UniProtKB/Swiss-Prot annotation:
<dbReference type="GO" id="GO:0006338">
    <property type="term" value="P:chromatin remodeling"/>
</dbReference>
<feature type="modified residue" description="Phosphoserine">
    <location>
        <position position="64"/>
    </location>
</feature>
<comment type="function">
    <text>Plays an important role in the ligand-dependent activation of estrogen receptor target genes. May play a role in the silencing of fetal globin genes. Recruits the 5FMC complex to ZNF148, leading to desumoylation of ZNF148 and subsequent transactivation of ZNF148 target genes. Required for the tumorigenicity of glioblastoma cells. Binds to 5-hydroxymethylcytosine (5hmC) and associates with the methylosome complex containing PRMT1, PRMT5, MEP50 and ERH. The CHTOP-methylosome complex associated with 5hmC methylates H4R3 and transactivates genes involved in glioblastomagenesis.</text>
</comment>
<feature type="modified residue" description="Phosphothreonine">
    <location>
        <position position="243"/>
    </location>
</feature>
<feature type="cross-link" description="Glycyl lysine isopeptide (Lys-Gly) (interchain with G-Cter in SUMO2)">
    <location>
        <position position="70"/>
    </location>
</feature>
<keyword id="KW-0694">RNA-binding</keyword>
<keyword id="KW-0007">Acetylation</keyword>
<feature type="compositionally biased region" description="Gly residues">
    <location>
        <begin position="158"/>
        <end position="196"/>
    </location>
</feature>
<comment type="subunit">
    <text>Interacts with PRMT1 and PRMT5. Interacts with the 5FMC complex; the interaction is methylation-dependent. Interacts with FYTTD1, SET and PRC1 complex members CBX4, RNF2 and PHC2; the interactions are methylation-independent. Interacts with ZNF148. Interacts with WDR77 and ERH.</text>
</comment>
<protein>
    <recommendedName>
        <fullName>Chromatin target of PRMT1 protein</fullName>
    </recommendedName>
</protein>
<dbReference type="GO" id="GO:0001701">
    <property type="term" value="P:in utero embryonic development"/>
</dbReference>
<dbReference type="GO" id="GO:0003723">
    <property type="term" value="F:RNA binding"/>
</dbReference>
<dbReference type="Pfam" id="PF13865">
    <property type="entry name" value="FoP_duplication"/>
</dbReference>
<dbReference type="GO" id="GO:0016607">
    <property type="term" value="C:nuclear speck"/>
</dbReference>
<keyword id="KW-0488">Methylation</keyword>
<dbReference type="GO" id="GO:0008327">
    <property type="term" value="F:methyl-CpG binding"/>
</dbReference>
<feature type="region of interest" description="Disordered">
    <location>
        <begin position="152"/>
        <end position="205"/>
    </location>
</feature>
Length: 249
């Protein structure tokens, strides 16, 4: 009764091929040749490169992109301009007169002017006409006395008139200049120096200053020159504010 009630299953399109044979044939049909893969990849790359070239050409033709390409980033030297110290620091402090400081270094009034040496506030930044003859080393090292490392030449600072409105203050430079044949200058700070005339140093170590090598002097000069003009102006103004009350005593 159960066999009669169940309908007979009839499979159409039957085959005698086994599953192994069927899947083997399917794998053979689907597997492409390696040469075809390489050729298709090269074709795709060529198409992509052609599209990229067209896109790049369209981008270059845009006005905004053309303007940006003209403003390419400059090299470090081009952005900084001249690599020397004078170009980075600009003009020296104040207006230097003719032949103010002749030497290899940048002509600037160094730190630590002698007490009572130059007066007149900002007007003291104009040096005398004869100028100083140095070899590029720093004039003043930071104290209140003139302490040149290489020494000034004879008749270093010449001129009868003084810079600025106050002229030359106490202990100032005479006609013979610093350490010259005239009265010279009285260095009141630590380690002043004595010239051929009556100029003398009243501080400690006036004539016993150690001799430094050229490399050490150049290193000191480079360290000083690396400071900006604003920093030097601030130091000079602070020092002149300290020395003005003392000179007016």
């Amino acid at each position: 009764m159960a066999a009669q009630s169940a309908p007979k299953v009839v499979l159409k399109s039957t085959t005698k091929m086994s599953l192994n044979e069927r899947f083997t044939n399917m794998l053979k049909n689907k597997q492409p040749m390696p040469v075809n893969i390489r050729a298709s990849m090269q074709q795709q790359q060529q198409l992509a490169s052609a599209r990229n070239r067209r896109l790049a050409q369209q981008m270059e033709n845009r006005p905004s992109v053309q303007a940006a390409l003209k403003l390419k980033q400059k090299s470090l030297k081009q952005r900084l301009g001249k690599s020397n110290i004078q170009a980075r620091l600009g003009r020296p402090i104040g207006a230097l007169a003719r032949g103010a400081i002749g030497g290899r270094g940048l002509p600037i009034i160094q730190r630590g002017l002698p007490r009572g040496g130059l007066r007149g506030g900002r007007a003291t930044r104009t040096l005398l006409r004869g100028g100083m003859s140095l070899r590029g080393q720093n004039l003043l090292r930071g104290g209140r006395a003139v302490a040149p490392r290489m020494g000034l030449r004879r008749g270093g600072v010449r001129g009868r008139g003084g810079p600025g409105r106050g002229g030359l203050g106490r202990g100032a430079m005479g006609r013979g200049g610093i350490g010259g044949r005239g009265r010279g200058m009285i260095g009141r700070g630590r380690g002043g120096f004595g010239g051929r005339g009556r100029g003398r140093g009243r501080g400690r170590g006036a004539l016993t200053r150690p001799v430094l090598t050229k490399e050490q002097l150049d290193n000191q000069l480079d360290a000083y020159m690396s400071k900006t003009k604003g920093h030097l102006d601030a130091e000079l103004d602070a020092y002149m504010a300290q020395t003005d009350p003392e000179t007016n005593d």
